[in-house]
Amino acid sequence: MQVTLKTLQQQTFKIDIDPEETVKALKEKIESEKGKDAFPVAGQKLIYAGKILNDDTALKEYKIDEKNFVVVMVTKPKAVSTPAPATTQQSAPASTTAVTSSTTTTVAQAPTPVPALAPTSTPASITPASATASSEPAPASAAKQEKPAEKPAETPVATSPTATDSTSGDSSRSNLFEDATSALVTGQSYENMVTEIMSMGYEREQVIAALRASFNNPDRAVEYLLMGIPGDRESQAVVDPPQAASTGAPQSSAVAAAAATTTATTTTTSSGGHPLEFLRNQPQFQQMRQIIQQNPSLLPALLQQIGRENPQLLQQISQHQEHFIQMLNEPVQEAGGQGGGGGGGSGGIAEAGSGHMNYIQVTPQEKEAIERLKALGFPEGLVIQAYFACEKNENLAANFLLQQNFDED
């Protein structure tokens, strides 16, 4: 028989197999034909007519119609996300280890050592993934600058790591962000995903509730549909939706503040218990959880903002995605303070949180941009939220708001 298989990313392929064979044999055939990295047997879940196929059961028992398709869901191993950012950075120091060692000796003899060269000897002896991206590329750039110009070595060596750090930091941040949001769908992809999961035999309301509970992660949404939504997240998602506009204007900026203020906390608190547990005591995280539960599609933008403000925190999130999602699913604690309004001119926009008012300063140009977005017919709270989430880019914010309106319709 010929089995048509379809992934949650809407990739379709066919496998020829004897119906007397077991489901596990089909999984092994998928792995051999499509690759062990993309479709490992241990990570495959085959779903037909809303049921997970049992490995030891023969295919004929499920009466699979060749005109229909079997859904393939692949769960990625947790360890894969850890070395990803570091592997791209390690190749450069590895290839220049010999040059680096000679560079270190010449710099040591210089009359005035440059502080930026302190980490030069590190990559020669340290290669684990825990080494930071910013310290690794420094010797590579130092070696390149030392070789052609030995006399004025101090000037280029001191300045070159800055450029290298910024580029490597950006690339590692983008890798972390892609890793953290790779499983999320928004916009038109969201609608396609709803249709795709409905084709497994579920009602639209069930699918939307599962996607909401999983924050638009299709793999986890299917698991919720099969196993049940934990903690009745379905009912929590509908509680108090109007508060989004009244609790405060730029809640995404509160998340940025949380990211900026938790760098030190991460290093001190993560030693005891789970690395993300410290977030529970952060009022900014409470606000973020409330925002995301009311509007899950904001999660990618907020993760991107965290990546800019605190890449270490984003790395922790990407390494512990399931725990992070679980924390976001927890009931929101009662927040103190009432919602605030907007100021005029170059004044500030009020934001509620933790029993007192916070103000975000905006320029007259930013105020005008917010007013133009409000003129499109969106409430002020949502406009400000979108404007800050989109890095004060008016066009992106407008597209985001229009997309939100389309999704709700």
Swiss-Prot record:
SUPFAM superfamilies: UBA-like, Ubiquitin-like, XPC-binding domain
Keyword Ribonucleoprotein recorded: no
Alphabetized InterPro entries for the sequence: Rad23, RAD23A/B_UBA1, STI1_HS-bd, UBA, UBA-like_sf, Ubiquitin-like_dom, Ubiquitin-like_domsf, XPC-bd
Positions of post-translational Phosphothreonine modification: T155, T164, T186
Pfam family for this entry, one: ubiquitin
Any GO CC annotation of this UniProt entry: nucleoplasm
Boundaries of every Ubiquitin-like domain copy: 1-79
Low complexity biased stretches: 81-143, 252-271
Domain of life: Eukaryota
PROSITE patterns xref list: UBA (PS50030), UBIQUITIN_2 (PS50053)
Subcellular location: Nucleus; Cytoplasm
Repeat is among the record's keywords: yes
Residues of the STI1 domain: 274-317
Keywords: Cytoplasm, DNA damage, DNA repair, Nucleus, Phosphoprotein, Proteasome, Repeat, Ubl conjugation pathway
Residues annotated as domain UBA: 188-228, 364-404
Biased composition (Basic and acidic residues): 144-153
Modified residues annotated as Phosphoserine in this record: S160, S174, S199
Family statement drawn from the similarity comment of this UniProt entry: Belongs to the RAD23 family.
Subunit text: Component of the XPC complex composed of XPC, RAD23B and CETN2. Interacts with NGLY1 and PSMC1. Interacts with ATXN3. Interacts with PSMD4 and PSMC5. Interacts with AMFR. Interacts with VCP; the interaction is indirect and mediated by NGLY1.
Entry's free-text remark on domains: The ubiquitin-like domain mediates interaction with ATXN3.
Its job: Multiubiquitin chain receptor involved in modulation of proteasomal degradation. Binds to polyubiquitin chains. Proposed to be capable to bind simultaneously to the 26S proteasome and to polyubiquitinated substrates and to deliver ubiquitinated proteins to the proteasome. May play a role in endoplasmic reticulum-associated degradation (ERAD) of misfolded glycoproteins by association with PNGase and delivering deglycosylated proteins to the proteasome. Involved in global genome nucleotide excision repair (GG-NER) by acting as component of the XPC complex. Cooperatively with CETN2 appears to stabilize XPC. May protect XPC from proteasomal degradation.
Designated name of the protein: UV excision repair protein RAD23 homolog B
Naturally occurring in which organism (per UniProt): Homo sapiens
Gene behind the chain: RAD23B
